[in-house]
Amino acid sequence: SVAQVSRFLLMFLYSLGEIIPKVRAFAFSNQLGEVTEQFDNFELEIAINQTIHEWGMGSTDYGGALAELERITSSQVDRKTTILILGDARSNYGDPGANSLKRLQEKSKRVIWLNPEPKSFWNTGDSEMQRLSAYCSQVHHCRTLRHLERIISEIARKTV
């Protein structure tokens, strides 16, 4: 489900780095990797193609990805940090990484999860959205530019 909107989500992530200072970007399917340098050093289309080629193949492993994110960023996450996750929360019946997300949430200012699937699909099959949302400040359905605009406006209102 994320494959269909991954380009859109990566364009959003790329654009965030141009607007907000100190954005670190990570991508994953079965492994997590930092793509901040690619986003900083390459034009949009090249950076996105490299990211999809390098990190977008394989079954999603939220447990492994969130554990790796925690390992890599734990010393930098503090009460000023906003963690933004773009994904469908489908665990492929594996570990969804709730414990890692909980620890990251406890150290950060907030965790915002953007899920491209319709809410009616959440918590069906291998979706772990309900379980993972317990450690999120906000959870939103986000599949289009209109959704994204609405969410950004809401986040900005809550930040002021």
Regions found by a protein language model. Give the residues of each.
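A short, conserved beta-to-alpha structural element at the edge of catalytic cores
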Residues: 16-38, 106-126
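Extracytoplasmic/secreted cell-surface and envelope-processing proteins
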Residues: 93-95, 150-151
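Von Willebrand factor type A / integrin I
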Residues: 102-160
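An amphipathic, basic-hydrophobic helix/alpha-beta surface used to engage anionic
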Residues: 1-22
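Structural motif
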Residues: 80-84, 110
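Short acidic, Gly/Ser-rich segments with clustered Asp/Glu that frequently serve as metal-coordination loops
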Residues: 1-7, 32, 90-93
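Von Willebrand factor
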Residues: 33-35, 39, 46-81, 118, ...
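Charged helix-capping and loop-helix junction motifs
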Residues: 10, 96-102
